[in-house]
Swiss-Prot record:
Subunit architecture: Interacts with BEM4.
One GO BP: small GTPase-mediated signal transduction
Keywords tagged on the record: Cell membrane, GTP-binding, Hydrolase, Lipoprotein, Membrane, Methylation, Nucleotide-binding, Palmitate, Prenylation
Main location: membrane
Other remarks in the entry: Present with 3870 molecules/cell in log phase SD medium.
Enzyme class: hydrolase
Residue span(s) of the pro-peptide: 190-192
Name of the protein in question: GTP-binding protein RHO2
């Protein structure tokens, strides 16, 4: 008899072009996307095992662009975990993680735990080796401060390009979703 998988829904939000889709692409398909295409809505399903528990993880990729703000709230329904992503080379995306994305997640899905994820971690190393680097990287301590301020369960960084930390992000997110007590009717709901 096959083992029944626990189902979990993960929703990733953040500014457009911050690296959300690349993260999901690398995690589910094992390779970095060759071209950037703005996301409207994409769903992926993958099976994984965390702490000996088989999990069917549904991944919801959302559009960060303003023109999709009216559609995005539908993705929050019954979310078990929210990833808020920002690009480590774009301080404004961290500010938006705190002011826009955390507020939106808490409004539509107040009981879902949040993990704050710094994306494009490889750019930190690249900037370190550039003599005249003009792009200012988000200090890790600033990101940790934002994570605390929004009540995130964890702050993590990863690079979809190199693969560093990608599996760790989803392991922590899945584990966090499993640790949350599920009360009947405690899932996120949307009233329109």
């Amino acid at each position: 008899m096959s083992e029944k998988a626990v189902r979990r829904k993960l929703v990733i939000i953040g500014d457009g072009a911050c690296g959300k889709t690349s993260l999901l692409y690398v995690f589910t398909l094992g390779k970095f996307p060759e071209q950037y295409h703005p996301t409207v809505f994409e769903n992926y399903v993958t099976d994984c095992r965390v702490d000996g528990i088989k999990v069917s993880l549904t991944l919801w990729d959302t559009a960060g662009q303003e023109e999709y703000e009216r559609l995005r709230p539908f993705s929050y329904s019954k979310a078990d975990i929210i990833l808020i992503g920002f690009a480590v080379d774009n301080f404004e995306s961290l500010i938006n993680a705190r002011t826009k994305w955390a507020d939106e997640a808490l409004r539509y899905c107040p009981d879902a735990p949040i993990v704050l994820v710094g994306l494009k971690k490889d750019l930190r190393q690249e900037a370190h080796f550039k003599e005249n680097a003009t792009d200012e990287m988000v200090p890790i301590e600033d990101a940790k401060q934002v994570a605390r301020a929004i009540g995130a369960k964890k702050y993590m960084e990863c690079s979809a390009l190199t693969g560093e930390g990608v599996d760790d992000v989803f392991e922590v997110a899945t584990r966090t979703s499993l640790l949350m007590k599920k009360e009947p009717g405690a899932n996120c709901c949307i009233i329109l």
